[in-house]
Amino acid sequence: MTKITLSDLPLREELRGEHAYGAPQLNVDIRLNTNENPYPPSEALVADLVATVDKIATELNRYPERDAVELRDELAAYITKQTGVAVTRDNLWAANGSNEILQQLLQAFGGPGRTALGFQPSYSMHPILAKGTHTEFIAVSRGADFRIDMDVALEEIRAKQPDIVFVTTPNNPTGDVTSLDDVERIINVAPGIVIVDEAYAEFSPSPSATTLLEKYPTKLVVSRTMSKAFDFAGGRLGYFVANPAFIDAVMLVRLPYHLSALSQAAAIVALRHSADTLGTVEKLSVERVRVAARLEELGYAVVPSESNFVFFGDFSDQHAAWQAFLDRGVLIRDVGIAGHLRTTIGVPEENDAFLDAAAEIIKLNL
């Protein structure tokens, strides 16, 4: 077959020179770079999943339930229990990971001539998804401590009048939390909708923005995922919680039968076993405290985190430091922020290997 490159294709001009998103996938012993839950699913969950797939396999010649009604019922029950906010399936929408959730929201509320504003550094897919939907992305820098500078944030929202504002809490890659009071201040000055990205909410003791949904029915959407605390990254299931009108909106842009029968069934099984799965959250939180304390003891600067990862520095060359960890068999994440790296909290043995490497690397003055 004739070899060609992207430059030979009639690609959209704004995509030329861009790079595909993705964390490095390398064959190393210790992988702490993608914020997965390191604990495998329980034997009971696996057995339930196998039995469920066996049951539905004879129906795979048929399209799946178009609107994932049963799954949304289960998600609503989970959110009601986990946050204390009573919701029904009419408040829930599910898709293939929170990235598809965010993409659908941008398709419905962004687009040509519209803008989305976010506080950087934050989740790197926000500007990528904005570009893919022809939504102009406005980046507002966080403060030196990586927290949202509220005076700057409110001033920029008033000046730029964005159609969409992203607030990620706990924030990725820094791990800090934006208080509900500050979320409300943002909602009250934002002219359009505010998407609160709570991908890591289960790791945080802070209250969920879902508690504000009744107060701001036309402006607030809370996005979540089952990829992190739920130990379900391979299942690719994201969802949002909002007023039912928002579900009506994304139904205008969603693809038909977007969630496969297997995805729906697997997610329902995972929700049935949520008590077991989320039982690992406390273990990871304890490990996060231990890892952060040891890093500080070694002389690193650590950003306070309420998630399943730790953001730390200061390096003069963070990529050289990343390579030094990799040379020691530990894969962590260089997210492109000067002087800093991010490590996912793994099982104790993985964290020990990371900390042993960190103890050696601090001496290199990288």
Swiss-Prot record:
One of its GO terms (molecular function) is pyridoxal phosphate binding. Keywords: Amino-acid biosynthesis, Aminotransferase, Histidine biosynthesis, Pyridoxal phosphate, Transferase. Belongs to the class-II pyridoxal-phosphate-dependent aminotransferase family. Histidinol-phosphate aminotransferase subfamily. This is Histidinol-phosphate aminotransferase. One of its GO terms (biological process) is L-histidine biosynthetic process. It comes from Corynebacterium glutamicum (strain ATCC 13032 / DSM 20300 / JCM 1318 / BCRC 11384 / CCUG 27702 / LMG 3730 / NBRC 12168 / NCIMB 10025 / NRRL B-2784 / 534). It comes from the Bacteria. Pathway: Amino-acid biosynthesis; L-histidine biosynthesis; L-histidine from 5-phospho-alpha-D-ribose 1-diphosphate: step 7/9.
